[in-house]
């Protein structure tokens, strides 16, 4: 769910969108569908109520290393590409594309453009997709965005992708700028993103992230069962809900814990980075 800078409520946004986008074909270039459900996932689930969505799994931001994690991901990508387009949820179809994750070379970009276009168009033909609306969350998809017969191209930016660890920042930045200039609309989720993207496209708007109100308000319902390991913690509880990755400001979390020593600071979510400094703080859980 979301709130806009115009003061429109999230309920009216959903109603308006479902009314405008009915019976349409939608492309979505994002992270892997099997990964954690992010804002893109929730948005496409809403749109899939009245439309069909072809979700194109992640096109890599960076060249893989010889690490165990990267090799495992590469093998999983190869195996997934051998499977046909599947429908994990009603009206949501998932394609596992193959591409060479190296964007500094013009030759590689040209190869990816042709190969990815062929893969996506083949999936579109099999599903009978026509005049799609293309929601691009992954700037690496710039290599084919706008070349798929789209009626509208939308770049939906929720992160400063060029600052991710291990990314070929300059090459990805070039792809992103080209994508923004070609897009009919650029949507950003934060003020800082608006400041950095609006110069590349006059049709840039800010739509901040929101939450599923009905889901989270259950925390105030006395009938909601609190897990035992949380129930026994000292009150109040200061919660962090989400992925704990290397872009999370650990210093701020540590300062919050130090400023409220009587409270319990609870981090709920998958951890993919070193949190040993936080683990040494007594009231961080």
Model-derived features with residue positions:
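A short beta-strand/loop micro-motif in the catalytic core of glycosyltransferases
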Residues: 54, 182-190, 205, 239
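Conserved donor-binding/catalytic core segment of Leloir-type glycosyltransferases
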Residues: 229-248, 254, 265-268
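N-terminal subdomain of nucleotide-sugar transferases
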Residues: 2-77, 258-260
